[in-house]
């Protein structure tokens, strides 16, 4: 019997680790922890382009702590996480969130798996995450939460969202 609070997903394949997931994510718990790598590829993203590797790296990063300036794999900040995820498929993204927002192909609508999403936080600079599916994305949220999955439908993220960049075809 699972005694974890509803906001946590039991990361059963990673003994001793839990991942904080926000935004009502029963879908994501099933998606990530019950064979997501075998799911049908998203339009424009094939297994050859690194989808399976990215999913594996997302799984490995969930629950890791947030440390400013960290690039993984033991800890991450937001742009360090994105850089580390993409390094696994041989792409070298810029180190800073602001710079990640100035490279790649601009995307405003029709987000796809792997798109780097950008947020402008008032008085706190830029924040990045990687879009997964539906409205969900993975990001290094901060010291209290570490690497988590959140929803773009959450009020905070809807207000801060500034667009996305596509690195996968």
Segments predicted by a language model, with ranges:
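Aromatic- and glycine-rich peptidoglycan recognition patches
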Residues: 2-5, 42-49, 68, 91, ...
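Solvent-exposed, polar/charged alpha-helical surfaces in well-ordered, non-transmembrane soluble domains
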Residues: 52, 56, 60, 80-87, ...
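Catalytic cysteine-centered active-site loop
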Residues: 64-113
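C-terminal segment of N-terminal export signals and the immediately downstream linker at the start
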Residues: 32-60
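N-terminal secretory signal peptides
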Residues: 1-15, 28-30
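N-terminal export leaders
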Residues: 15-22
């Amino acid at each position: 019997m699972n005694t974890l609070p509803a906001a946590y997903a039991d990361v059963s394949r990673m003994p001793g680790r839990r991942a904080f997931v926000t935004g009502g994510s029963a879908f994501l718990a099933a998606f990530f922890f019950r064979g997501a790598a075998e799911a049908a590829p998203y339009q424009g993203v094939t297994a050859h382009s690194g989808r399976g590797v990215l999913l594996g790296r997302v799984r490995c990063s969930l629950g890791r702590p947030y440390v400013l300036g960290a690039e993984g794999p033991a800890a991450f900040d937001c742009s360090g996480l994105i850089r580390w995820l993409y390094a696994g498929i041989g792409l070298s993204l810029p180190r800073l969130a602001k710079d990640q927002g100035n490279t790649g192909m601009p995307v405003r609508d029709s987000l796809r798996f792997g798109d780097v999403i950008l947020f402008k936080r008032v008085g706190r600079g830029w924040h990045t995450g990687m879009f997964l599916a539906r409205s969900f994305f993975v990001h290094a949220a901060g010291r209290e939460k570490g690497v988590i999955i959140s929803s773009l439908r959450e009020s905070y993220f809807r207000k801060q969202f500034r667009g996305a960049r596509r690195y996968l075809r």
